[in-house]
Regions:
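Active-site helical microenvironments for divalent-metal-assisted chemistry
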Residues: 2-238
Length: 238
């Protein structure tokens, strides 16, 4: 797989990510639909629309993501960026991006996706992308986890790396703890090499982003604004 890696300045991308976390996904969805219309075959667009509606309609079973409505801009951003980076665009990469975290967030499994009409390869890919949170800081587990993703295909590796990129862009909203430092160290150990195999520029950008986030730390004002937005989103959904 060839990718055309291009991102803005780390500071600008982080600011855009923070803004997306304090608004619902409408604008991000509109951008994804426009991008799909420009890059994919017209016949593929109904399946993309179906996936957007399906993923957005799911209920959260995960306390870390109490509001799917507030969270949904993340998978939309992952899908958009993955499609943007692919030299040869595919509808499957968009589906993988939109669905990449549905097992963890909603409690679905492979059979649920198969019943919805998704391919066995897509359903298996989502399973492989779903990390066992009990072992997420275990290097032995992570070695096998990332190897299976790359064995499945470079498209799945791209989703893994773009997912991590989008998560890292939000780190100004997160308090610094040993767990966070471990997360950054393990990203350097496992995700950066994977990204570098897709594109040397991708790996270098991740390293630059990690260095930036370590330098600026947590912006408490941004964090408080995000927590206020999330609280409102949860209360509105009740």
């Amino acid at each position: 797989m060839k990718i055309d890696f291009s991102m803005g300045l780390v500071e600008a991308e982080a600011a855009e990510k923070a803004s997306s976390m304090m608004s619902y996904s409408d604008q991000a969805e509109h951008r994804l639909r426009e991008f799909c219309a420009a890059r994919l075959a017209h016949s593929e667009l109904p399946q993309i629309e179906k996936t957007i509606l399906f993923a957005r309609s799911l209920k959260s079973e995960n306390a870390a993501h109490p509001s799917v409505r507030a969270y949904f801009s993340h998978p939309v951003r992952v899908a958009t960026l993955a499609l943007r980076l692919e030299t040869v665009p595919s509808a499957e990469i968009v589906q993988l991006g939109l669905l990449h975290n549905v097992f963890e967030v909603s409690g679905l499994n492979e059979s649920n996706l198969l019943k919805e009409g998704y391919s066995r390869r897509t359903a298996e890919g989502i399973r492989l992308l779903t990390v066992d949170r009990r072992r997420q800081y275990d290097p032995v587990y992570l070695e096998a986890f990332h190897r299976k993703i790359e064995t499945h295909g470079e498209d799945l590796a791209l989703i893994r790396c773009v997912d991590r990129l989008d998560n890292l862009l939000a780190f100004q909203l997160i308090e610094r703890t040993k767990v966070i430092e471990d997360y950054l160290d393990l990203t350097i150990r496992f995700v950066v090499p994977m990204a570098s195999r897709l594109s040397p520029q991708f790996g270098a950008y991740l390293l630059k982003l990690i260095a930036y986030m370590r330098e600026v730390g947590c912006d408490r004002q941004l964090k408080e604004r995000y927590e206020s937005f999330l609280k409102e989103a949860v209360e509105t959904a009740v």
